[in-house]
UniProtKB/Swiss-Prot annotation:
The lineage of its organism: Eukaryota, Amoebozoa, Evosea, Eumycetozoa, Dictyostelia. It comes from Dictyostelium discoideum (Social amoeba). The keyword Kinase does not apply. The keyword Metal-binding does not apply. SMART domains: AAA. This is 26S proteasome regulatory subunit 10B. One of its GO terms (cellular component) is nucleus. The gene is psmC6. The 26S proteasome is involved in the ATP-dependent degradation of ubiquitinated proteins. The regulatory (or ATPase) complex confers ATP dependency and substrate specificity to the 26S complex.
Amino acid sequence: MSTEETKKEQALQNYRDRLIEHKNAELRLNKAHELIKKLKKDFQKTEDHIKTIQYIGEIIGEVLRSLDEERFIVKACNGPRYVVRCANYQDKAHLLVPGARVTLDLTTLTILKILPREVDPIIFNMTAESPGSVSYGEIGGLSNQIRELREVVELPLMIPELFIRVGIKAPKGVLLYGPPGTGKTLLARAIASNLEANFLKVVSSAIVDKYIGESARVIREMFGYARDHQPCVIFMDEIDAIGGRRFSEGTSADREIQRTLMELLNQMDGFDTLSKVKIIMATNRPDVLDPALLRPGRLDRKIEIPLPNEAGRVDVLKIHAANITKHGDVDYEAIAKLADGFNAADLRNVCTEAGMFAIRAERDYVMEEDFMKAVRKCQEAKKLEGKLDYQKV
């Protein structure tokens, strides 16, 4: 082998060695970068822990009034009142109104932050319940009632200028009344599901408290929360629990319920007609409600949710039977004729019972005969129910 070839081979070997060294150096560099990144993250975490340990708490207070542009009288949570100044006043001037909750520095008592209003946990529980996904197409036989309800609740929230142009005041609230099982709560859930608004679901019986004044306070906080989180829809189910007719005699519990009703009447008069707070009430006993609650200006529209007629029963049956595995044709009209006097909940029960008959027969599909058997079975159960008679509101 010549000298030139030897030199060439040696140069190639050196090049290969250098390439391997370069690759190894790159790997070491990448590992070093990863280590630096991890150390930085650990350093930041340690810094946060140190800040948390060294953090000095703040006092919560309430603004009573402003003395001038920069000084405020604030009542601290532990009792004393102070004249204080505000850090970054220009950014917070419009929020420092009487009643605003603020945090104060422990040493200088300077206003540092503005807190949201205090909300009772009961109110948060009202907002936590999800209405679910309910479309108007899932409600059968109530097209007129849906239109009337949407006119009262949706239009003022979505297109308020329409009422200003026409020159009328938007309705404040609506009462849904009718026999049990006709879809009053389902209508409210559909409104909540299809409307981009906050939704408070209130069970009226849960508001009543054994301590005097507590029930009225919950009503005040409920409407206060609704005003702060507009647009908001308040749905009060079983309103007859607190909205019953007032009378002079009664126990202390009856008087507490009457005080709760008076607070509700006061709050319903309180908010502006075109504000984005609407109230829906539901009951199956409209005859026991107080006349002051029913008057226009509080509940402007009363919508009766009646038992479905034959066409309505067919619609409801088709909606509930849509997801059922069926074999052969099903004559919904014949089933609806047999189900005279049934409400929507009964018709849903008919579909469930039809499925149970199919399971009992060890089938994975439902036939028309199962629906007929289910209707007859539900008719026997309906005989146990009492009939509720009341006049239209």
